[in-house]
Each structure stands twice: as C-alpha cells, then as structure tokens.
Amino acid sequence: MNTTPGTVGSDPVILATAGYDHTVRFWQAHSGICTRTVQHQDSQVNALEITPDRSMIAATGYQHIRMYDLNSNNPNPIISYDGVSKNIASVGFHEDGRWMYTGGEDCTARIWDLRSRNLQCQRIFQVNAPINCVCLHPNQAELIVGDQSGTSHIWDLKTDHNEQLIPEPEFSITSAHIDPDASYMAAVNSAGNCFVWNLTGGIGDEVTQLIPKTKIPAHTRYALQCRFSPDSTLLATCSADQTCKIWRTSNFSLMTELSIKSSNPGESSRGWMWGCAFSGDSQYIVTASSDNLARLWCVETGEIKREYGGHQKAVVCLAFNDSVLG
C-alpha cells in the first residue's frame, strides 16, 4: 500500500476524534498537535472507524456515511452515501476490508460491499427498535447488534439465523464488544450496568453460545461504551458519570478509574465520557468527552499523559490505530 509522506496514513499512529462541531480532527498522539482537520458539513459525527489497511476513515452522522482518504490531504470525502434514514450510530469493518457494517436509528444493521467505489448495501438485518451499536465477532461471521429495547441480537452471517439476549429489559443496550480472544462478550446499558458472557463455539460451523458470567454495577448513570483491550486482559466502560473505568478480565474487579470530575466543588459537570480506545500494547487508553477534549491516559496509574484540545463542542467518538502493518 502506498502512503504519501506527510499524510495521516503515513504516521504509524493514527488518532482521530469527532463530535458535535462538525469536524474530524487528526492528532499526533505523542505531542498532542492537531495535524489535519476535515469539515464534516451536514451533521454531527456519531461514529468513526479506520479501515484495516489504514487507507480510509469512515464517519457516520445523520442520514449519511462519509469516507475520507488518509493517504492524501484531500479535504472532501472520497465516498459518500446518503440513502439511510435517521442517525447512523455505529460503524466497523471486516478484517480484510471487503465489507463494512453499520447500525442506526432506522432499526437496521447493514452490510456494505467496499470492493466497488460506490457503496452497495448487500444485506439488511431489521429489528424492532433503534440500534445503538454493532460489533463484529473475531470470527468475522457473526454481528452483535444492540438496540434501545434492551435486546442484543446475535446475527449469524453464514446462516442468517439470529439469537436474542435481553439482560435487562427496558434499559437500552448502548455498546457491546467481544474481546480479541473471543472468550468474553460485554454489553453496557442505560442503567449503567455491564453484563459479561463467556463465549463458546463460534469456530467453523459451530454457532457461538453465550453463557452469563457476571453483572457489574459499573456506573450510577448511563453507560456509553465498553471496549476490551487488545490483549484481552482489561475491559473499559465509559459513562455519563464523567468516568472511564478499567476492569480486570481475570475476575472483573476494578483496576483503575479515569475521571474528568473537577476537584473544585463549585465547578459544574464536565460532561459525559463518551468513548475510548486502547493502544495496541494495552498500556494506554484514549477517551473522548463532552468537555471538548480527548485525553491519553496510562491504564495502570490513571495518569493523564496528553490532552487533545481544539474541538469547539463535545467530542463523542474517536478512532485510534497504532498497529504497524506487516
């Protein structure tokens, strides 16, 4: 793959943030310097994801998907799609980049063929409530779809069969994730709880089985995202309570609490901790929050290593890739 020197794609570490100010910003992770800003005209950005080959970044918003080139300084999206109604809340990619998946408020999860330059919707999975999150099993053959009725759907892409889990009815599933080892699935909800399942099967033609493992009363307010670390030893949960909490997957005990709460009693809330992403070595985590900042933290000590300031409104999503392609 060719990368142009001086572009985002030429940097071994790609960090992008976006939110309510209609921009996507790219940062030099170690220095905190903003290296590129892309205008995202039509709406806020709800979700960001970098393609596995690090050539493009997808940004989803209200009724559209935009894909920007990371290997040039072209300010305009190189792929645009406007044929989905309402907010698109979630986006991700098959590991070899053949297709992309999305989910949104129109109650559908979709699979898009990326091999043609115009986005073709290949498959649609319809549910009965707006979708908040979609995550791909490491086997690349099952999608987990979380909706606002509190249901997690496991959509088997090979058979089109689906199973449903309803850990806490009436509380919206806001985020779900499976660890890279495919040992656990976690889901968080609008009550602030985190549910963890053990995974078995999911290899070859075996269907994945989910066995309830634990329920963590992770947050006292709305939980917004959960993410396992690349080494599968940690689970992070982000919340409207201004914290991101890091849990050990060995026993799901709390290891570190990352907080943006002010130590000044007179200062009002700095807002929600919207999302997070681990570094490839699982030692650091980047968070996005309503106080217009992204932050880089040391996972073990909870120390803030870097702040990324420049957004004019809340930062609600980020994408982080520091893996070196072989």
UniProtKB/Swiss-Prot annotation:
Keyword flag Phosphoprotein: yes
Posttranslational modification: Phosphorylation at Thr-51 by CDK1 promotes ubiquitination by the SCF(FBXW7) complex, followed by degradation. Ubiquitination by the SCF(FBXW7) and SCF(FBXW11) complexes following phosphorylation at Thr-51 by CDK1, leads to its degradation by the proteasome. Ubiquitination at Lys-305 and Lys-313 by TRAF2 via 'Lys-63'-linked polyubiquitin chains inhibits formation of the mTORC2 complex, while promoting formation of the mTORC1 complex: ubiquitination disrupts the interaction between MLST8 and MAPKAP1/SIN1 to favor mTORC1 assembly. Deubiquitination at Lys-305 and Lys-313 by OTUD7B promotes MLST8 interaction with MAPKAP1/SIN1, facilitating mTORC2 assembly.
Database matches in PROSITE patterns: WD_REPEATS_1, WD_REPEATS_2, WD_REPEATS_REGION
Subcellular locations according to the entry: Lysosome membrane; Cytoplasm
Position of the Glycyl lysine isopeptide (Lys-Gly) (interchain with G-Cter in ubiquitin) cross-link: K305, K313
GO terms for MF: protein serine/threonine kinase activator activity; protein-macromolecule adaptor activity
WD repeat locations: 1-37, 40-80, 83-122, 126-165, 168-207, 218-257, 268-309
Any single GO BP term: TORC2 signaling
Glycyl lysine isopeptide (Lys-Gly) (interchain with G-Cter in SUMO3) cross-link, chain position(s): K86, K215, K245, K261, K305
Tissue specificity comment: Expressed at highest levels in the brain and testis, followed by lung, heart, kidney, skeletal muscle, spleen and liver. Also expressed in epididymal, abdominal and brown fat, small intestine and pancreas.
Cross-link type Glycyl lysine isopeptide (Lys-Gly) (interchain with G-Cter in SUMO1), residue numbers: K313
Keyword terms: Acetylation, Cytoplasm, Isopeptide bond, Lysosome, Membrane, Phosphoprotein, Repeat, Ubl conjugation, WD repeat
InterPro entries assigned to the protein according to its UniProt record, in alphabetical order: G-protein_beta_WD-40_rep (IPR020472), MLST8 (IPR037588), Quinoprotein_ADH-like_sf (IPR011047), WD40/YVTN_repeat-like_dom_sf (IPR015943), WD40_repeat_CS (IPR019775), WD40_rpt (IPR001680)
Modified-residue entries (N-acetylmethionine), positions: M1
Record-level GO cellular component terms: cytoplasm; lysosomal membrane; serine/threonine protein kinase complex; TORC1 complex; TORC2 complex
Induction of expression: By insulin in adipocytes (at protein level).
SUPFAM superfamilies: Quinoprotein alcohol dehydrogenase-like
Residues bearing the modification Phosphothreonine: T51
Job of this protein: Subunit of both mTORC1 and mTORC2, which regulates cell growth and survival in response to nutrient and hormonal signals. mTORC1 is activated in response to growth factors or amino acids. In response to nutrients, mTORC1 is recruited to the lysosome membrane and promotes protein, lipid and nucleotide synthesis by phosphorylating several substrates, such as ribosomal protein S6 kinase (RPS6KB1 and RPS6KB2) and EIF4EBP1 (4E-BP1).
Assembly, per entry: Part of the mechanistic target of rapamycin complex 1 (mTORC1) which contains MTOR, MLST8 and RPTOR. mTORC1 associates with AKT1S1/PRAS40, which inhibits its activity. mTORC1 binds to and is inhibited by FKBP12-rapamycin. Within mTORC1, interacts directly with MTOR and RPTOR. Component of the mechanistic target of rapamycin complex 2 (mTORC2), consisting in two heterotretramers composed of MTOR, MLST8, RICTOR and MAPKAP1/SIN1. Contrary to mTORC1, mTORC2 does not bind to and is not sensitive to FKBP12-rapamycin. mTORC1 and mTORC2 associate with DEPTOR, which regulates their activity.
Family: Belongs to the WD repeat LST8 family.
Protein name: Target of rapamycin complex subunit LST8
Species per Swiss-Prot/TrEMBL record: Rattus norvegicus
Gene name tied to this protein: Mlst8
